[in-house]
From Swiss-Prot:
Compositional bias segments (type: Acidic residues): 84-93, 331-343
Protein name (Swiss-Prot/TrEMBL): E3 ubiquitin-protein ligase RNF113A
InterPro entries given in the database record: CWC24-like, Znf_CCCH, Znf_CCCH_sf, Znf_RING, Znf_RING/FYVE/PHD, Znf_RING_CS
Family matches, as SUPFAM superfamilies: CCCH zinc finger, RING/U-box
Source organism per UniProt: Homo sapiens
Amino acid sequence: MAEQLSPGKAVDQVCTFLFKKPGRKGAAGRRKRPACDPEPGESGSSSDEGCTVVRPEKKRVTHNPMIQKTRDSGKQKAAYGDLSSEEEEENEPESLGVVYKSTRSAKPVGPEDMGATAVYELDTEKERDAQAIFERSQKIQEELRGKEDDKIYRGINNYQKYMKPKDTSMGNASSGMVRKGPIRAPEHLRATVRWDYQPDICKDYKETGFCGFGDSCKFLHDRSDYKHGWQIERELDEGRYGVYEDENYEVGSDDEEIPFKCFICRQSFQNPVVTKCRHYFCESCALQHFRTTPRCYVCDQQTNGVFNPAKELIAKLEKHRATGEGGASDLPEDPDEDAIPIT
């Protein structure tokens, strides 16, 4: 190795080492080109002619019962193993189809009453329930009443009773619905009715404005008036539901509370006066009553001798006098009494 080799010998004796780079393994996502094999009589350089696509044949895999997959699950195979194409066609399931035959009737399917008379079959039979036992006992007691004991055992519920119970639930329970023990359930499922007689409004708060439960009260705290369901149904039947009447929302004025006769003399007003408690009298009647007592004739409050002219009443009386007959109908007077002018 220490000797120097000649150039001709060096070429023959030198060993060359070739290092091959590994190919990329991440090219799985690349799009593969179709394999084109040129025909032997044609050159591969011709771009005008098309290329032949070689498709690999699908291998037939032997069915393995230990391997399960969702693909091709619709095919039913009779046995494990290969099947011929004819056998596969025979074993393929036919397309499912549902065919209904018309009854040529417009009636709905099912019972004619749409199940309104359906019976709850989980309860005890009518011939064996507590109601039937009670009715049989009542019938036997009626037959044995007034007879001697015949020494016949009729069951634990049918012992002869020599005294008829009265004023008790058992004595008055001819139907058996008010006695103790189980009660027979309704026969039909649609027999349950709930009446709307519970407005769920706090009665204490509605009447007094105060409730001892406070915010924890489960009823509505409202002092308004509500209509029950039966009242709404009655208005619907009479055709009055939803009809708003203006007079229900009119606020009465103070003039409507003014009387048209004096409280003391029961006659039409002459020089009307009004007290502090808003009561109207004739001037002469008020002064005459004040000589007896300083209190009001109606409410017995202290007037202190203060009588003011009733200007509102005077204006109302003049208005009704001007209307003529309308005013006479609103202010009826005695037929034998003459009209007294207002000064």
